[in-house]
UniProtKB/Swiss-Prot annotation:
Binding site for Mg(2+): D143, D145, D253
Cited CDD domains: Ubl_UBLCP1 (cd01813)
Entry protein name: Ubiquitin-like domain-containing CTD phosphatase 1
Main location: nucleus
Catalysed reactions listed for this entry: O-phospho-L-seryl-[protein] + H2O = L-seryl-[protein] + phosphate; O-phospho-L-threonyl-[protein] + H2O = L-threonyl-[protein] + phosphate
GO MF annotation terms: metal ion binding; proteasome regulatory particle binding; protein serine/threonine phosphatase activity
GO process terms (BP): regulation of proteasome assembly
Role: Dephosphorylates 26S nuclear proteasomes, thereby decreasing their proteolytic activity. Recruited to the 19S regulatory particle of the 26S proteasome where it dephosphorylates 19S component PSMC2 which impairs PSMC2 ATPase activity and disrupts 26S proteasome assembly. Has also been reported to stimulate the proteolytic activity of the 26S proteasome.
Broad class of enzyme this protein falls into: hydrolase
Domain of life from the UniProt record: Eukaryota
GO cellular component: nucleolus; nucleoplasm; nucleus
Ranges where the FCP1 homology domain occurs: 133-294
Length: 318
């Protein structure tokens, strides 16, 4: 019986339909070598498990009970990939095509049709609470790709692509904030990334819940047309007894994602080309200090997160 598998690697998806249940994991890796150029010994396939452990190369695919069109994330680097890693990202990358909220000057926040979309998400979107919200804590909402993790570069493990100081940042933030992950991908990829980065299993902090692209809404802007955004109103509507505009901050490398809540968004510098920038990126280290400073406030609406570095410098100079 033939299998249909979808492999995600380097920001792209590859469909494999040439294998059968009698083929092995190694056969799959050989097929992936032909598609991606990554040698089998350098491939790590997330989600291919046998009795709770990564499946060995000689395990037959039929023994893994894979469903049709199962999606598998691959980690791994081409032999010649350093050149690719240091090269420019694709021209159509979201980071390049992003725009400044203030320049767009669109009044979308209070449009009735957008508020209705948020109401539908509040009613229909199912949130799996991983750890209960804590009384008196503020809320930190975090994007994943280019915020916590360089998702375009190639590496043998996710840890190599992790933004520096990630665990220290989350450990410190957890003292004052409930932490929510919100990525514009599907939940399977979010869970796989959080596991690979060691976020979902870290004993020093806990994630309250995670949201995927299904919690986002589409809004219309005069200059840019239809765009997808992350409305914090979905969270506030579902957890109004804990979170509001006054105690929520969101980090994202794409400013348009908080177009519905510009006052609550902080546009973080994107973490790209991890192999080149890993030793010099200090963004999370500085933002750790910023979060600690503003945690003392009762109302975040008096802040302008666009000038967070100026605010931090002023506070530290006192």
């Amino acid at each position: 019986m033939s299998l249909s598998l979808i492999i995600k690697w380097g920001g792209q998806e590859y469909t494999i339909t040439s294998l059968s249940e009698e083929d092995t994991v190694l056969d799959l890796k050989q097929s992936l070598k032909g598609l991606t150029g990554v040698l089998p010994e350098r491939q790590k396939l997330l989600g291919l498990k046998m009795k709770g452990k990564p499946a060995d190369d000689d395990v037959k695919l039929g023994a893994l009970k894979l469903k049709p069109n199962t999606k598998i994330m691959m980690m791994g680097t081409r032999e010649e990939s350093l050149e690719d890693v240091l090269g420019p990202p694709p021209d159509n990358d979201d980071v390049i095509n992003d725009f400044d909220i203030e320049e767009e000057v669109v009044e979308v926040e209070n449009r009735e049709e957008n508020l209705l979309k948020i109401s539908r998400r509040v009613k229909e979107y199912k949130v799996e609470i991983l750890n209960p919200p804590r009384e008196g804590k503020k809320l930190l909402v975090l994007d994943v790709d280019y915020t916590l993790f360089d998702h375009r570069s190639c590496a043998e493990t996710g840890v190599e692509l992790m933004r520096p100081y990630l665990h220290e940042f989350l450990t410190s933030a957890y003292e004052d904030y409930d932490i929510v992950i919100w990525s514009a991908t599907n939940m399977k990829w979010i869970e796989a990334k959080m596991k690979e980065l060691g976020v979902s299993t870290n004993a020093n902090y806990k994630i309250t819940f995670m949201l995927d692209s299904a919690a986002m809404i589409t809004v219309h802007t005069p200059r840019r047309g239809l765009i997808d955004v992350k409305p914090l109103g979905v969270i506030w509507g579902k957890f109004s007894e804990y979170y509001s505009k006054k105690n929520t901050i969101m980090f994202d490398d794409i400013g348009r994602n908080f177009l519905m809540n510009p006052q609550n968004g902080l546009k973080i510098r994107p973490f790209m080309k991890a192999h080149l920038n890993r030793d010099k990126d200090k963004e999370l280290l500085k933002l750790t200090q910023y979060l600690k400073e503003i945690a003392k406030l009762d109302d975040f609406l008096e802040l302008n997160h666009k000038h967070w570095e100026r605010y931090l410098s002023k506070k530290q100079g006192q």
